[in-house]
């Protein structure tokens, strides 16, 4: 009887390496697949692709599996990076890892793996898949400190039915122990924290290679000009560092934060104090929705939600089509609203709002706007909250 073939996405890191070893130990026919998805600066100081491939080959030799490299750079640029730039140009702050998972790791990679006669694919993500009553559920990882279900919330039933997450039941500390015990050459390699497939580099410098600067005024909520920004695309909601107001004599001495953008006037609004009302939101609207089960929760469903990675689930109520918030948008896309029990800090357009029912990840959408802590005011990528000077 032939062994079941599993193709493992191997990055050269510890997690995917241990994933491949675990599956080999469990008796699977394991094939490693290294994805090359970025080519713009292969010889640059921040590109680790060459060393990552060397690490993959070394690990494959040690555990005794075949490995190959596949180039998805064109797919990545078309499906992920182009959207990444469009979102930043529109003043939003996208999460490319979410789109990369849906379009590259679990679409282009999955398709290629199936062409290699694989029954399943596996990655080193910290999450779990559970089959129940003929349906597949995406669950949080056993190690909640490493849970990556937030980045995987756009996976559908077809993708989950072919996916294994061997590390979902294992704490990260144990993964490191396994790597050391079996003598993996990359056992002490640090975890990657850079943009998906682009690596760790000064982000503003990287973005400026593709988007031009466009200076404009930096204002307070009452309309006072306190500085100049280099371009709205280079700032994100809640940002504190890199604003350029650290030595400013304006204000009360509290730290400054980015609070809103007005695309029409090219104005960046900043506020002082971590808990300023312009930074706090109890409601949001999200579009470009995706549900793991293929359908949304019931209107009025009480759930938890994350508006950024590693955030604790925030209690909220889901508003579907019955509330009017999920009505079709300009492009015919569904929307949903979330009403939170407690105010959320710096809810950022372009980021994902991901819903949970306990351990189960339900799916989510891309944040379009959020109501601020001040009644009747909201902030989106293109509009600041109602200004004091306009009252």
From Swiss-Prot:
Organism of origin: Burkholderia orbicola (strain MC0-3)
Region of interest (Interaction with target base in tRNA), residue spans: 95-97
Gene: mnmA
Identification of the protein by name: tRNA-specific 2-thiouridylase MnmA
Catalytic activity: S-sulfanyl-L-cysteinyl-[protein] + uridine(34) in tRNA + AH2 + ATP = 2-thiouridine(34) in tRNA + L-cysteinyl-[protein] + A + AMP + diphosphate + H(+)
Molecular function terms, GO-annotated: ATP binding; tRNA binding; tRNA-uridine 2-sulfurtransferase activity
Any Gene Ontology biological process: tRNA wobble position uridine thiolation
Keywords: ATP-binding, Cytoplasm, Disulfide bond, Nucleotide-binding, RNA-binding, Transferase, tRNA processing, tRNA-binding
Transferase is among the record's keywords: yes
UniProt: ATP binding residues: 9-16, 35, 124
Site (Interaction with tRNA): 125, 351
Disulfide bonds: 100-196
InterPro entries referenced in this protein's UniProt entry, alphabetically: MnmA-like (IPR004506), MnmA-like_C (IPR046885), MnmA-like_central (IPR046884), MnmA-like_central_sf (IPR023382), Rossmann-like_a/b/a_fold (IPR014729)
Subcellular location: Cytoplasm
Function description: Catalyzes the 2-thiolation of uridine at the wobble position (U34) of tRNA, leading to the formation of s(2)U34.
UniProt superkingdom: Bacteria
Residues annotated as signal peptide: none
